[in-house]
Amino acid sequence: MAKVNVRDFIEEQYGLFINGEFQASESGDTLTVTNPANGEDLAKVAKASKSDVDKAVQAAQDAFDSWSKTSKEERADYLLEISRRIHEKVEHFATIESLQNGKPYRETSTIDVPLTANQFKYFASVLTTDEGSVNEIDENTMSLVVNEPVGVVGAVVAWNFPILLASWKLAPALAAGNTIVIQPSSSTPLSLIELAKIFQEVLPKGVVNVLTGKGSESGDAIFNHEGVNKLSFTGSTDVGYGVAKAGAERIVPTTLELGGKSANIIFDDANLDQVVEGAQLGILFNQGEVCSAGSRLLVQSSIYDKVMPKLKEAFENIKVGDPFDEDVKMSAQTGPEQLEKIESYVKIAEEDSNANILTGGHRLTDNGRDKGYFFEPTIIEIKDNSHQLAQEEIFGPVVVVEKFEDEAEAIKIANDSEYGLAGGIFTTNINRALNVAKAMRTGRIWINTYNQFPAGAPFGGYKKSGIGREIYKDAIKNYQQVKNIFIDTSNQTKGLY
């Protein structure tokens, strides 16, 4: 491991951030956060209980009255200041993200943290065009349409992009005038609790409350709390069912960004250099721990024998290791459970004659990697999209490859999934690209690239991949209610009674 002095970036212990103050949990219980690249302990964080959730929700409720009445200009200024401070501390937050998550510093410093800062900046600008409307129905009747904040938002985010996913909830929720109780994953909470230090300096007390704890305990308590008016969750589809149920039982609006098994389609006229890079972006970025990962690679049969040797060579040349090594392109999986899950799917391929492991398929333990959770970039060829490996989300650097003959077959295979989060198309034919994109039942399609997430491009899924869209101007509507004020100016009765 490249030498990083952990205590220059991370404290030994963190409390919960409630009502503008850091404090121990009521029980005094803590959780230990470890570095997945070397197994070393990083810090202890408070483990929130239901009573801590009660305190956080109460703080958010108390702050809502004044925060919701701040002007759009004031809220925009707050968001811009948060953005500025994150930009000033890119190295700080990127280092923490790499330490707790295992992803390469080259990604956290150029993607995760800058995009986080930009979310707050973007939604500050969205506020300038977030306007109501007036409709003069006739000479004596006027309809006013007013956008109002929902109230207290309860949010839980996954471990694969801890600080970035948090910004996808925080920025639009705050812009809309809501207060929020948010919890990161128990395995990767440090960047968000460090971000709370900026909230402490910038925002009024209680506007943002950050809890750390188990999703199955304090996370569930947030989603089932009577004082929470809006739910927002990013994570697995399995957990998403429970969040959706919690919202349905209380009739609370719910935004869900869930799993995927996205198809990355390669046509025979594609630029092969773009194809090789695009396939790697699709499945090796963030160690494949991406909900939108291009985990099904569909290659037109006429170029299959030309593409696969190039792809195999590219995967085998990926340097896997220390996240702070500048030459490393892929680092550690986030934890032992994820590594075991990946290994279990590779074992399925090993035991199935209908699957062929073209390259990879093993945990890496040499050259000092034995204490971390490293896995080889892996390519598995399959013959049928009904195969378990083509239908279930692996969430690692494992791509399954299938052949197709023409556009119609590519579309059929791509849509043969219970998920519909994303997909990719590589072709130089714009008509083909648009026709196939329109036919794919997914919320995001990349053409001649993959896994790009700039603010201003809506992201979210069809089918079991979720409800709602994020990182786009309309995402502010996820955190608003529409009020209609209907006015009769005639000063006369209607004569009906």
From Swiss-Prot:
Domain of life: Bacteria
EC identifiers of the protein: 1.2.1.3
Active-site residues, record numbering mapped to chain: E257, C291
Name of the protein: Putative aldehyde dehydrogenase AldA
PROSITE patterns: ALDEHYDE_DEHYDR_CYS, ALDEHYDE_DEHYDR_GLU
Homology family: Belongs to the aldehyde dehydrogenase family.
Binding positions (NAD(+)): G213, K214, G215, S216, E217, S218, G219
Molecular function, one GO term: aldehyde dehydrogenase (NAD+) activity
Record has Oxidoreductase as a keyword: yes
EC category: oxidoreductase
Recorded catalytic activity of this chain's protein: an aldehyde + NAD(+) + H2O = a carboxylate + NADH + 2 H(+)
InterPro entries: Ald_DH/histidinol_DH, Ald_DH_C, Ald_DH_CS_CYS, Ald_DH_CS_GLU, Ald_DH_N, Aldehyde_DH_dom
Keywords (A to Z) from UniProt: NAD, Oxidoreductase
Pfam families recorded: Aldedh
